[in-house]
Amino acid sequence: MKKRLAGLVLLVCVFTLLGVACGSTQSTEADDFAVDTPAAEILAAVKASDWVVIEDSRVSSGEARMHAFYDACMRGEVGKVKIATYYTLDADRVSAELYAQEKDSYPRIFLTELTFDGTEYHVSTRYSIEAEPETVATYPYLVRMQGEAPTADALYDRYDRYVLADNAALTMAEIERAMFSSVAPLGEHKIGRWHMVYTNLIGN
């Protein structure tokens, strides 16, 4: 009996040590970050956690996680993915006037939680310095869009995007026309509602 108990204790210890050694990815939620937490500090935390991280339109962490979420949704499986979108302001890419006006408000980070309940997609996005989400919405479709850069002098070679939409057949060309249209507000063109949750500019 004592030998059996000792063996059981040893087995528990082994599994405990294995768990510590393997170091499973720490999970954090958007609400874990106070509004006064610096954007750079949040960035470091989400990169060490189970988030998809996008820095200046390029994915730096969690790319496979985003694709796995999408694939699971296409199979009808419920799930959740968290996306952190981080922006800096490059003085070489904006006017001196704009840089002077906006530099103190950068870097910025937006925290998005996207869930699929088996039927619809629910999105909530919070600007890190705000207490409440700036976007809370539900969409019927998550559309993946991939393509080449629109011009030869673009700062990237190709793109990979995920867009929540009312229209499953929505295209990037339609979104671009809507973005530059003065007729309707952004995201509310004749193509229906849409909300881009993931952008990865690749190459160059």
Question: Where on the chain are the PLM-derived regions?
Answer:
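Extracytoplasmic electrostatic interaction patches
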Residues: R93-N204
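N-terminal export/targeting and maturation segments
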Residues: T25-L111
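C-terminal motif of bacterial Sec signal peptides marking the signal peptidase cleavage site
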Residues: L17-A21
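N-terminal leader/presequence segments that precede the conserved core
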Residues: G23, T28, E132-T135
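Bacterial N-terminal signal peptides that target proteins for export
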Residues: M1-V9
